[in-house]
């Protein structure tokens, strides 16, 4: 999560000991809300992982709310978030606002079953993993990377099939090309459990 300081509002709280200033994201962290905004990178993933571990240490029995607005990004960085979501004790509820594409969609689907949400105008996109940055070098090296990419593709498809309650063949077919979905379509597919029109519609 990377925000320019001049764009981040500061919240002033009054207490018996005077005023205390928080940036808005630190204030929301107190409410157990974690954001993934923008591409999934090593830096953004490390911030999310650190916040998840911190919130577990604060209260291992209280849900964490993971808000996602991401076009996707690094598979290895995303898997560090995924593994941490499963490693910690609290349930992690996921919510898509804006978009959850590629690794963003994978993380959205990985929330606690029954606690995966999207706002009405969200867009979700699934596809097969990509090689980023262009791949060059010897033919044998390219072959090694191609085999690794196929292994990653199979693993992601198997995991997402489990989270969506679908057959592996469905994921292999439906991720072959960019596959865009509305919130309604994502719910039907099994990527989310509920569409939230407003806070009052939150049920779990």
Curated annotation (Swiss-Prot):
GO BP annotation list: protein quality control for misfolded or incompletely synthesized proteins
Reaction catalysis annotation: Hydrolysis of proteins to small peptides in the presence of ATP and magnesium. alpha-casein is the usual test substrate. In the absence of ATP, only oligopeptides shorter than five residues are hydrolyzed (such as succinyl-Leu-Tyr-|-NHMec, and Leu-Tyr-Leu-|-Tyr-Trp, in which cleavage of the -Tyr-|-Leu- and -Tyr-|-Trp bonds also occurs)
Domain of life: Bacteria
Ribosomal protein keyword on record: no
Listed EC numbers: 3.4.21.92
Single GO molecular function: serine-type endopeptidase activity
GO cellular component, one term: endopeptidase Clp complex
Record key words, sorted: Cytoplasm, Hydrolase, Protease, Serine protease
Alphabetical list of PROSITE patterns matching this protein: CLP_PROTEASE_HIS, CLP_PROTEASE_SER
Subcellular location(s) of the protein: Cytoplasm
Active-site residues, as the UniProt record annotates them: 102, 127
Signal as UniProt keyword: no
Enzyme class: hydrolase
Predominant cellular place of this UniProt entry's protein: cytoplasm
Subunit structure, as described in the record: Fourteen ClpP subunits assemble into 2 heptameric rings which stack back to back to give a disk-like structure with a central cavity, resembling the structure of eukaryotic proteasomes.
General function of this protein: Cleaves peptides in various proteins in a process that requires ATP hydrolysis. Has a chymotrypsin-like activity. Plays a major role in the degradation of misfolded proteins.
Family, as annotated: Belongs to the peptidase S14 family.
Name listed for the protein in its UniProt record: ATP-dependent Clp protease proteolytic subunit
Gene (name only): clpP
